[in-house]
């Protein structure tokens, strides 16, 4: 066995007709008389190894009969192309050995398990074909994010995880002790990217962010990853163009490189292929009109006169976003929300001071907001008034106001949540499967 090369399952096509060694974990096993069918996975994929008793002898055949799920094994055999399925290969096994047996029955058996059980065993659940496919797609999305910004002249600038102040209240921040001072885990690197944009013109940060929200929805995690670009001399229109190009690039990359994984997930790739420019761009007022049309129809169908119209000036909830995005086959951009529901640093619309020059991008199929951004306020006096109006501590923003004191400039940017994007592209019902070890309201382990 030592005389044969150890190869990965991803390289089988180059070794058809050759005898090789495969090394990995026993994913599944079934037997039929004098044949064993061993499914081996090695981290790159899986392959079926067909073992005939006549080819390996009684001792090896008996050892294969006893091997348990997820034992580490070597299988030696000839690589053969599947007679009916193009691109699929099998191993005609001629040798076998166990390198690392399991300590008893593997906890995740082929039977159905509940979500809580699987999350308790997340460290093992990652080995399943479905989870493997999801995290492969996640990897490709992250790679595409970096390639997109690298290809457009952006500089990666790391934002701090510890922040010294609670800029927008402490209700959704994780507080910790920092050498005797109060510190908070970051919710966003955006303010720091504004400083970086003044230094580099085009900058982005990419890292974990933390929200202490008491939310148990399918869209919320306490810890998630976000990429936040910021560009000098860019306005809201340019910001929307950048976001549109960005999402198209990511989806195209996944379709190009991860179709086998999408097939494992039974994802309707036709819905992803529809993600093409231009995206519909509607104002907040138009989105409210869509909601009110839906509510009017609901009143008519259900005969419930007490269903009110959507109140202008409120932010959209998850159900609202689902209704709005349901009108379109691709992401929809909603811009110019009421300033009262957006952050203090958003620039006001010069034609209507009630509105912010902001944009949210809603993914189709009810996946909700995946991008939020806008143009930042670049006037010092206006920003000072906004900080005061939001009852924020002005001393905490001295460095941020310096960006307006010393060479102020128009700029814009956005943030994209990786996990929501993975959920949308993979077609998942919940974000908990989009990150290797999710942190949620009632889950801190494993």
Curated annotation (Swiss-Prot):
Enzyme Commission identifier(s): 6.1.1.22
Family: Belongs to the class-II aminoacyl-tRNA synthetase family.
Molecular function as annotated in GO: asparagine-tRNA ligase activity; ATP binding; nucleic acid binding
Pfam families: tRNA-synt_2, tRNA_anti-codon
Gene3D superfamilies: Bira Bifunctional Protein, Domain 2, Nucleic acid-binding proteins
Annotated localization: Cytoplasm
Protein name (Swiss-Prot/TrEMBL): Asparagine--tRNA ligase
Lineage: Bacteria, Pseudomonadati, Myxococcota, Polyangia, Polyangiales
Catalytic reaction list: tRNA(Asn) + L-asparagine + ATP = L-asparaginyl-tRNA(Asn) + AMP + diphosphate + H(+)
Keyword ATP-binding applies: yes
UniProt organism field: Sorangium cellulosum (strain So ce56)
GO biological process: asparaginyl-tRNA aminoacylation
UniProt KW keywords: Aminoacyl-tRNA synthetase, ATP-binding, Cytoplasm, Ligase, Nucleotide-binding, Protein biosynthesis
Cytoplasm in keyword set: yes
GO cellular component annotations of the record: cytoplasm
Complexes and interactors: Homodimer.
């Amino acid at each position: 066995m030592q005389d044969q090369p150890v190869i990965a399952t991803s390289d089988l096509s180059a070794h058809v007709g050759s005898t090789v060694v495969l090394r990995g974990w026993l994913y599944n096993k079934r037997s039929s008389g004098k044949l064993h069918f061993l499914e081996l996975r090695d981290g790159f994929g899986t392959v079926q190894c067909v073992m005939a008793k006549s080819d390996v002898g009684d001792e090896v055949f008996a050892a294969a009969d006893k091997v348990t799920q997820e034992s580490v094994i070597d299988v030696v055999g000839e690589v053969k192309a599947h007679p009916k399925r193009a691109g699929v290969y099998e191993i005609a096994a001629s040798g076998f050995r166990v390198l690392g047996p399991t300590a008893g029955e593997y906890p995740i058996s082929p039977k159905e398990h509940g979500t809580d059980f699987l999350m308790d065993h997340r460290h093992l659940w990652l080995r399943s074909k479905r989870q493997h496919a999801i995290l492969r797609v996640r990897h490709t999305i992250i790679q595409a994010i970096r390639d997109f910004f690298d290809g457009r002249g952006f500089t990666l600038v790391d934002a701090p995880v510890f922040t010294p102040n609670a800029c927008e209240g402490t209700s959704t921040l994780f507080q910790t002790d920092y050498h005797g001072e109060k510190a908070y885990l970051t919710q966003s690197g955006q303010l720091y990217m504004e400083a970086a944009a003044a230094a580099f013109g085009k900058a982005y940060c990419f890292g974990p962010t933390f929200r202490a929200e008491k939310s148990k929805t399918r869209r919320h995690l306490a810890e998630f990853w976000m990429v936040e670009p910021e560009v000098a001399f860019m306005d809201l229109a340019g910001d929307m163009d950048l976001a549109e190009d960005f999402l198209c690039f990511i989806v195209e990359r996944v379709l190009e490189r991860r179709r086998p994984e999408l097939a494992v997930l039974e994802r309707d790739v036709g819905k992803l292929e529809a993600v093409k420019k231009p995206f519909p761009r509607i104002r907040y007022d138009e989105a409210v009109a869509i909601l009110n049309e839906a509510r009017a129809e609901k009143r008519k169908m259900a005969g419930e006169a007490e269903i009110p119209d959507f109140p202008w000036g409120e932010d959209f909830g998850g159900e609202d976003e689902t209704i709005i995005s349901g009108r379109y086959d691709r992401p929809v951009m909603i811009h110019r929300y009421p300033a009262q529901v957006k952050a203090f640093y958003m620039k006001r619309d010069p034609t209507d001071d009630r509105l912010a020059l902001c944009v949210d991008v809603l993914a189709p199929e009810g996946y909700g907001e995946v991008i939020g951004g806008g143009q930042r306020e670049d006037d010092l006096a206006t920003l000072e008034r906004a900080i005061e109006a939001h009852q924020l501590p002005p001393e905490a923003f001295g460095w941020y106001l310096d960006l307006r004191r010393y060479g102020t400039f128009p700029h814009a940017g956005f943030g994209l949540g990786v996990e929501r994007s993975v959920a949308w592209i993979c077609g998942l019902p919940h974000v908990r499967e989009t990150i290797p070890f999710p942190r949620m309201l009632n889950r801190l382990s494993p």
